Amino acid sequence: RRQRQMCIRDRLEAAHLILPRLRDITGESVQLYRIENGQRVCIATSEPPTGLRDSVPVGAHLPLYVGASSKVLVAWAEMSIQRSILAEGEITETQLRDTRRRGWAQSIGEREPGVASVSVPVRDARGTVLAAIAVSGPIDRIAKRPANMWAADLKTASSVITKHL
């Protein structure tokens, strides 16, 4: 348990270095999520200083069956979690398989109307998925294919966080 708490602390420290840079590159809100008690929890965020943005406060609990970060977290979660979420019917096995194959997931208006997002996994040194990092914002700015705009930048940010773990 102590080692897990240290890993979470290290991940947060790395995220606090990387998330603002990713926010500056994208001009959009950036979040880091993990699974906790069957939900996705925002554990770090960085928001643009002005303008319309998708605000998710640290500590917010969100459902695991909608949104890009949920797809990422569930795609690499334990089978019991995958089965539970698949039974809800919002996320499909095909979506999870596609997420694992591409290394990212996107959503358009799933969690909140008018908001789009793209997310990638954050792994530890052994390759275990610990979290999901996401860029989110208004569909009007991000467009209907946010992965085309930000998946590569997210993957780079994820790699940097992994190197800090």
Description of each model-found segment:
Residues 1, 35, 124-125:
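Short, acidic, Ser/Thr-enriched surface-loop or helix-capping motifs
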Residues 3-8:
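Short, small-residue-biased leader/transition segments that mark boundaries at the very start
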Residues 9-51, 79:
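All-alpha effector-binding/dimerization core of bacterial HTH-type transcriptional repressors
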Residues 10-13, 60, 64, 145, ...:
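Residues at secondary-structure transition points
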Residues 21, 25, 98, 160:
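Solvent-exposed, charged/polar functional surfaces in cytosolic regulatory/catalytic domains
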Residues 44-113:
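Short, solvent-exposed recognition segments
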Residues 75, 157-165:
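Signal-transmission/dimerization alpha-helices at domain junctions
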Residues 88-159:
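Extended hydrophobic
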